[in-house]
Design a protein with these regions (language model features):
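Non-transmembrane, aqueous-exposed alpha-helical and coiled segments at domain scale
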Residues: 1-128
């Protein structure tokens, strides 16, 4: 079983939102992982992904890392290496400034973790 509650906060002009990803059986989980492969295929073709695809990619990253028994601190510290601003559509880095996860995975206790500015914007410029 995979149960992920993701709370997203962005810039002040972007309303916060919550998404719940729940996959109770192997079939549902396979659909989730197949959708992640489609997103990775888009990235491999140098196509930019949107907010929902970016959030799904981070959820997949969290699941993979927790199943590999990686520490929460390491997961949080490495989140900024998952996506760069040139791989996402305009506005995605501003929308995903902070992502807080509550994750129940298989029969393990609930884990909580947060990503702060997971998409680095140091070389990111909006044209006016």
């Amino acid at each position: 079983m995979i149960l992920i509650k993701a709370e997203v906060k962005g810039e002040s002009d972007v309303p916060p939102f919550t998404r719940v990803f729940e996959y109770r059986d192997k079939f549902d989980q396979q659909i989730f992982f197949d959708s992640l492969e489609k997103i990775k295929d888009k990235l491999a073709k140098n196509l930019r992904i949107n907010t929902n695809e970016s959030l799904a990619l981070y959820c997949g990253y969290v699941v993979d890392q927790l199943r590999a028994r990686i520490s929460i601190e390491s997961i949080e510290n490495n989140a900024a290496k998952i996506l760069l601003s040139d791989k996402v559509m305009i506005g995605v880095p501003e929308t995903l400034r902070r992502i807080s996860f509550e994750v129940i995975l298989d029969n393990f206790p609930k884990k909580k973790l947060s990503f702060h500015e997971p998409i680095p914007t140091s070389h990111y410029t909006l044209a006016v």
